A protein has these predicted regions:
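GT-A fold catalytic core of metal-dependent nucleotide-sugar glycosyltransferases
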Residues: 1-38, 56, 63-64
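Glycine- and acidic-residue-rich phosphate-binding/metal-coordinating active-site segment common to enzymes
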Residues: 22-29, 34-41, 52-54, 78-91, ...
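A short, conserved beta-to-alpha structural element at the edge of catalytic cores
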Residues: 24-48, 162-170, 178-181, 197
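Short, P/G- and charge-enriched loop/turn segments at secondary-structure junctions
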Residues: 45-52, 133-136
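A recurrent flexible, glycine/aromatic-enriched loop bordering the glycosyltransferase active site
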Residues: 49-61
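A glycosyltransferase accessory/donor-loop signature
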Residues: 59, 64-205
Length: 205
């Protein structure tokens, strides 16, 4: 299992790890933002020279079949493309090289804050989500996420009031170097917001 650094795991990953990808290279969730508008989707297909966006996945959370990758020498294919300037860098390269051998995961394994997880109208107001997921999938993902992915320009260590910032700070408070993080926020004038967040945490424990 590969996880980006800007994620929080909220539940057991054993079910994800046990998923069958014997005939695949990777498994991930559909990268909804690349599915719409159609012009953007077509442009990605042209750049990567692929026939469909149906299996284009976000690279932030991946289940990887290393055995198949080594068997088919995918490292060489990656090395050949790594010097090219793809718009989404590693994500584009992974989708290009692994095309045809990608399994789609349920979006609860990579619930991205940029899609407004706490907004009841997020699905209705986002055409990309409607193309990538069913309403049932999306509701399940945002209400019962296994992994929260802060896949946006704003991160919880920059804005303690963003969606699911509470979960990130709760995890950060357990780290041995949390005092360093806290001191940095004091320097940035964020101490009041952090105190409010931590006091809220104390009330919930």
């Amino acid at each position: 299992i590969y996880l980006d650094v800007d994620i929080i795991v909220l539940d057991d990953l054993s079910e994800l790890y046990r998923l069958n990808i014997d005939d695949k290279y990777i498994a991930g969730i559909r990268a909804a933002g690349y599915y719409y508008p159609e012009k953007h989707a077509q442009n990605t297909m042209n750049i990567l020279d692929i026939d469909s966006m149906e299996y284009y996945v976000n690279a932030g959370v991946l289940l990887i079949n290393l055995q198949n990758m080594r068997r088919d020498n995918l490292e060489e294919a990656f090395n050949q493309l790594i010097c090219k300037k793809y718009p989404s860098m590693d994500q584009d390269i992974l989708n290009k090289v692994c095309y045809g051998k990608i399994r789609i995961l349920h979006p609860r394994y990579n619930a991205m804050t940029k899609y407004k997880l706490l907004d009841d109208n997020s699905y209705k107001n986002n055409k990309a989500l409607q193309i990538a997921y069913s309403i049932r999938e999306w509701d399940s993902a945002r209400k019962h996420p296994v992994i929260i992915h802060y896949a946006d320009k704003i991160k919880p260590w920059e804005d303690v009031e963003m969606e699911y910032a509470y979960e990130w700070w709760r995890a950060a408070a357990l780290l041995p170097f949390f005092s360093d993080i806290y001191r940095q926020y004091i320097k940035n004038g964020q101490m009041k917001k952090i105190n409010v967040q931590l006091n809220e945490e104390n009330r919930r424990i």
